[in-house]
Curated annotation (Swiss-Prot):
UniProt cross-references to PROSITE patterns, sorted A to Z: RIBOSOMAL_S8
Major site of localization recorded for this protein: plastid
One Pfam family it belongs to: Ribosomal_S8
Classification of source organism: Eukaryota, Viridiplantae, Streptophyta, Embryophyta, Bryophyta
GO molecular function, one term: structural constituent of ribosome
Name of this chain's protein: Small ribosomal subunit protein uS8c
Role, per record: One of the primary rRNA binding proteins, it binds directly to 16S rRNA central domain where it helps coordinate assembly of the platform of the 30S subunit.
GO biological process: translation
Description of how the protein assembles with itself and partners: Part of the 30S ribosomal subunit.
The gene coding this protein: rps8
UniProt xrefs under HAMAP family: Ribosomal_uS8_B (MF_01302_B)
Length: 132
């Protein structure tokens, strides 16, 4: 049984948000790098960088907070398609999160992208997670 790196990343970010931690470290894989790029592009995180320690490679996410109470920009981060139950959708049936306020991250034949990009390109794929 393998590790679910996406669920590991989501849980690490969720826990860091609860503790109001500025940075979080997750194992680097191609999928986590691409999801990190999307989160950065959509404005959910401040920054992320790659860090190599001995032979292990990590991504360090700098989380974004607003106001004096440090309210996190990422309210909810939910894993949808899991290793035991994959969820796929064509471009017409990709769900909208909070009426378009949140994003759906999909794994498509053209790479990992948001729901808006997938609808524009008219391609479906595996629904990885919801972010809002």
């Amino acid at each position: 049984m393998g590790n679910d790196t996406i669920a590991n990343m989501i849980t690490s970010i969720r826990n860091a948000n609860l503790e109001k931690t500025k940075t979080v470290q997750v194992p680097a894989t191609n999928i986590t790098k691409n999801i990190g790029k999307i989160l950065l592009q959509e404005g959910f995180i401040e920054n992320f960088r790659e860090h190599e320690e001995s032979k292990n490679c990590f991504l360090i996410f700098t989380l974004k907070y607003q106001g004096k109470k440090k309210k996190p920009y990422i309210t909810t981060l939910r894993r949808i398609s899991k290793p035991g139950l994959r969820i796929y959708s064509n471009h017409k049936e990709i769900p909208k999160v909070l009426g378009g306020m949140g994003i759906v991250i999909l794994s498509t034949s053209e790479g990992i992208m948001t729901d808006r990009e997938a609808r524009e390109k008219k391609i479906g794929g595996e629904i990885l997670c919801y972010v809002w």
